[in-house]
């Protein structure tokens, strides 16, 4: 069978990890067709040096008609490019899942995918267990909560914390609210909360707690979804990416796992 082609949108620390991982581990099934960033003139030489093809424009990506486009850039990238990609017959892999907390955007992407025979794939990112979360929620009367514990530097720049200082000598809860409220206040920090919510109880029912913990070396995510008969707890601790303390290297590898699953005759759910 011919290889499937994958375009990558975004080439920060995680985009670089993803492109290299696809080349190293899935080269029999996939080929990276090219890479596009909003700052392509700045990034073009680095992309070439790494052995990949830079797209000179977003239109060049569309004209190339890859099988999949992987967004590994930002919520804004999902807003800007998602619908256009789907209408062009290109399936979309989303890592900045926080974008899907916007009901109108999520519905637009769903309708575009359905009308054009494409799909939107939501990656598990820095967590996982979406199959369990879906199952528990489908059984009915489900409740959900996700606790996030991160070092203060991982939370820097969040709109919710503008004008606020975080203590450097003790752990402190800095946010309590719904997943929808969390992604508005922490757009680069809680994609996992939105993904877990969409897979289970919804963004308005999923409760989110964010703690700042000085000296913490990893990002801790503890997801609890329960109903009257089942209580599921998923806990993942992962070290942040050295190049971007707000993100986990696991996010890039979750895309690799998704694509491997899509290429396999046996799928794990």
Briefly describe each language-model feature range.
Residues 25-47:
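NAD(P)-binding Rossmann-fold cofactor-contacting core
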């Amino acid at each position: 069978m011919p290889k499937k082609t994958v375009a990558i949108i975004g080439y920060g620390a995680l985009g670089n990890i993803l492109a290299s991982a696809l080349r190293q581990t899935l080269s029999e099934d996939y080929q990276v067709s090219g890479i596009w960033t909003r700052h392509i003139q700045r990034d073009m030489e680095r992309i070439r040096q790494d052995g990949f093809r830079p797209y000179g424009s977003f239109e060049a990506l569309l004209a190339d008609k890859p099988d999949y486009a992987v967004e590994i850039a930002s919520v804004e990238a999902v807003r800007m490019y998602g619908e256009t990609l789907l209408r062009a017959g290109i399936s979309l892999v989303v890592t900045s899942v926080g974008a899907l907390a916007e009901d109108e955007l999520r519905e637009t992407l769903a309708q575009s995918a359905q009308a054009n025979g494409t799909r939107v794939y939501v990656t598990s990112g820095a967590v996982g267990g979406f199959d369990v979360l879906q199952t528990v929620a489908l059984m009915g009367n489900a409740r959900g909560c996700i606790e996030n514990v991160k070092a203060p530097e991982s939370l820097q720049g969040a709109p919710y914390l503008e004008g606020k200082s975080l203590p450097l000598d003790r752990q402190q809860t800095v946010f309590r609210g719904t997943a929808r409220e969390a992604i508005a206040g922490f757009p680069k920090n809680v994609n996992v909360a939105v993904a877990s919510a969409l897979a289970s109880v919804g963004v308005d029912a999923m409760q989110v707690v964010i703690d700042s913990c000085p000296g913490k070396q990893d990002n801790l995510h503890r997801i609890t979804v329960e109903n009257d008969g089942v209580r599921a707890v998923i806990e993942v601790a992962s070290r942040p990416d050295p190049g971007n303390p707000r993100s986990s290297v696991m996010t890039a590898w979750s895309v690799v796992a998704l694509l491997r699953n899509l290429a396999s005759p046996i799928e794990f759910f």
